[in-house]
């Protein structure tokens, strides 16, 4: 797989060949690939890739606290370029990185403007040894997580709302409750 800021055209062409092969099965395909040039995005579009995941991750105001390699505006510009080419967009965020409730609302307002076809909400799973490994997640209760998902449903009703990372921790076997709010859940890494 590919992830990051810069890829060679050769790497993208290799991925495009794989996409063309998978499309022969009639599968709807989504890639989470990072930043692309317009030329590279067109290569994937011409290979019949349907959707690209490019999460906002956080609000504009909080973004510099979680990322130093690029700006929030660069993410938004990348998404708009992908939409202009014709891709469906999957874009959401991560809850629990230290953002305020206002940041959650602001992120959802940005997503409402983008109008992604799918909006995944991830709940932070701190991993020791990473920059967010010691993050206090005591505020990520089942009730709070459900409120965030409900807010996403109300604020971005045209998008398929998806509960992604953290579902198995924060909903602890209560996933049936999720289905009253979300369109799909991720289980064992799969939608």
Located regions from the model:
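Conserved Radical SAM active-site core
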Residues: 1-92, 97, 101-114
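Auxiliary Fe-S-binding modules of radical SAM enzymes
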Residues: 24-25, 112-191
């Amino acid at each position: 797989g590919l992830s990051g800021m810069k890829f060679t055209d050769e790497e993208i062409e290799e991925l495009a060949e794989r996409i063309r092969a998978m499309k022969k099965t009639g599968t709807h395909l989504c890639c989470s690939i990072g930043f692309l040039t317009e030329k590279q995005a067109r290569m994937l579009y011409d290979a019949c890739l349907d959707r690209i995941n490019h999460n906002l991750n956080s609000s504009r105001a909080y973004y510099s606290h979680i990322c130093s390699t690029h700006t929030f505006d660069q993410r938004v510009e990348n998404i708009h370029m992908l939409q202009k080419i014709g891709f469906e967009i999957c874009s959401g965020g991560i809850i629990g990185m230290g953002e305020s409730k206002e940041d959650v609302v602001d992120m959802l307002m940005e997503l409402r403007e983008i109008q992604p076809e799918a909006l995944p909400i991830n709940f932070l799973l701190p991993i020791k040894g990473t920059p967010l490994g010691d993050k206090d997640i005591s505020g990520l209760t089942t009730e709070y997580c459900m409120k965030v998902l409900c807010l996403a449903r109300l604020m971005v009703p045209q998008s398929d709302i998806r509960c992604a990372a953290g579902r198995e921790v924060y909903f602890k076997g209560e996933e049936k409750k999720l289905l009253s709010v979300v369109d799909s859940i991720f289980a064992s890494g799969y939608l």
